[in-house]
Amino acid sequence: MRVSASVKTICRNCKVIRRKGVVRVICTDPRHKQRQG
């Protein structure tokens, strides 16, 4: 899980979603998981 100020999709499987007001990136590749904060 990477925490960064700006989350960007890395590959085409990455999806940007909002969960409880937190912007997240979910992907099939666990290394691409990100969270904004």
Swiss-Prot record:
Pfam families: Ribosomal_L36. HAMAP family: Ribosomal_bL36. Belongs to the bacterial ribosomal protein bL36 family. GO terms for cellular component: cytoplasm; ribonucleoprotein complex; ribosome. This is Large ribosomal subunit protein bL36. Coiled coil: none annotated. Keywords: Ribonucleoprotein, Ribosomal protein. One of its GO terms (molecular function) is structural constituent of ribosome.
